[in-house]
Regions:
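Gram-negative bacterial Sec-dependent N-terminal signal peptides
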Residues: 1-22
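Membrane-embedded beta-strand positions in outer-membrane beta-barrel channels/transporters
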Residues: 65-67, 104-106, 175-177, 218-220, ...
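Outer membrane beta-barrel
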Residues: 24-37, 54-196, 221-226, 360-364
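Detector for outer-membrane/organellar transmembrane beta-barrel domains
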Residues: 212, 217-347, 359-361
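Transmembrane beta-strands of outer-membrane beta-barrel proteins
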Residues: 26-34, 76, 80-84, 116, ...
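Structural signature of outer-membrane beta-barrel channels/translocons
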Residues: 15, 69-73, 110-112, 179-184, ...
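Outer-membrane beta-barrel "beta-signal"
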Residues: 387-403
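Gram-negative outer-membrane beta-barrel proteins
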Residues: 36-44, 88-94, 124-128, 196-200, ...
Length: 403
């Protein structure tokens, strides 16, 4: 009997570590962010019929999402993790962009050396400054109306249109990322997006028959201490080709580069000030047989936020610089500046539920066509959204619930 008892204890001790290693955690989470808003874009420089977007009301589901994530302890300081996050269109229930794992989703490993993931995820360039925007770059208030933009909507799936291929606010498909551990407030991320051109006829809108192989390289470094946050980031898009489609010309090799810096200071959770500056450069090696072509733009953004009790107020201003064009017979594009002014008031009903009111306006010069980056107005002219010189304006009321 004593021998049997000892055997049972021994078996339990052997099984215990294996059971512990197999334990995992699973979390179901989500954000429901819906508003009713009035939007318009008037004042088009073209004067053509249909070049303006007349005022109308709409209900918008601003990046609402549902997700599942978890970890598994593998022992010896190593863990596996996963996340499956999908967009939820509460405004109309459509599946446009709202399919399984359509948002940040992946699987990977975490250790003392940092973590690595495979899947689809926001680029380090995008992540580096998104926290400086009080909205998290959501809806018509998002700073991607200016930052990361050339009059382009954000790219959720690596990009299939001109506008998306030109954007530097990207969720990158077919990506491998490395995130470093934090050391004395310093941390970094690196990413490589494959472009996945080996199967099918197109990737990122580039024909496989052209022989080009699109790829993305992105990296960031950030420092956080006390109330300070500072970051620098860079990103290159190889052969994304946002130009030749305009001229119906044979596609040629090229690259697009983005460089960005951001800083934020927060004081006692009462107020915060932030600023972002970036330089975007688009380069085609040989456009329409006329030689190399470059397009350069400098954008910047400033924001202030004040919190008192359940109330919060945020004001922001962003500006897109004039476009500098060179090569292939092009010269600088005059009247191509734009700016965006945004105001937002929030009221917290609880830790997970809040109401908000907002207003925003983008002022486009005659040759500019900036639009709301994450909730654009319907396209009216070629890839331009809205028409050249039209000024998108919006205001409304909304509600956010998280779980």
């Amino acid at each position: 009997m004593q021998l049997k008892r000892i055997s049972l204890i021994s078996a339990a001790l052997v099984a215990a570590p294996a059971a512990a290693f197999a334990q995992s955690t699973v979390q179901i989470y989500g954000t429901l962010n819906v508003d009713i808003e009035s939007v318009e874009a008037t004042g088009s420089a073209t004067g053509a019929l249909g070049s303006n977007f007349q005022s109308r009301s709409r209900v918008t589901s601003n990046s609402s999402n549902l997700g599942f994530r978890g970890t598994e302890d593998l022992g010896q300081g190593l863990r596996a993790f996963y996340q499956i996050e999908s967009q939820v269109n509460l405004d109309n229930g459509s599946q446009g962009g709202a399919f399984w794992a359509s948002r940040n989703s992946g699987v990977g490993l975490i250790g003392g050396w940092g973590q690595v993931l495979l899947g689809q995820w926001d680029s380090p360039y995008k992540v580096s400054t998104v926290r400086i925007d009080p909205t998290g770059d959501v809806g018509i208030l998002g700073y991607s109306g200016i930052i990361g933009s050339t009059g382009a909507v954000t790219a959720g799936q690596g990009g299939q249109t001109f506008a998306e291929r030109a954007s530097f606010e990207r969720r990158v498909a077919n990506v491998i990322q490395y995130w470093s551990p934090t050391w004395r407030g310093l941390t970094g991320r690196l990413a490589y997006g494959t472009g996945d051109t080996n199967v099918g006829s197109t990737a990122n809108g580039v024909s496989e028959a052209s022989g080009l192989r699109p790829a993305l390289y992105s990296g960031m470094v950030s420092f956080e201490s006390g109330g300070w946050y500072a970051t620098v980031s860079a990103e290159r898009h190889k052969d994304f080709q946002p130009f030749n489609t305009l001229f119906a010309a044979p596609q040629s090799s090229g690259h697009d580069d983005g460089y960005k810096a951001g800083v934020q200071y927060s004081f006692n959770s009462t107020w915060s000030l932030g600023a972002v500056a970036e330089h975007l450069k688009y380069h085609a090696d040989n456009i329409s047989g006329l030689g190399a072509f470059e397009r350069k733009i400098t954008n910047w953004y400033v924001v202030g936020k004040y919190n008192v009790g359940p109330h919060s107020v945020a004001l922001s201003y962003g500006q897109k610089g004039e476009e500098k064009l060179s090569g292939a017979g092009f010269s600088d594009l005059p009247d191509s500046k734009a700016n965006q002014i945004t105001a937002r008031y929030g009221y917290s009903l609880s830790k997970r539920t809040s109401l908000y009111a907002f207003a925003t306006r983008i002022n486009n010069d005659a040759n500019a066509f900036q639009t709301f980056g994450n909730s654009p107005i319907t396209a009216t002219q070629l890839f331009r959204d809205p028409a050249r010189g039209a000024d998108p304006t919006g205001f409304g009321l909304g509600m956010i619930h998280t779980f």
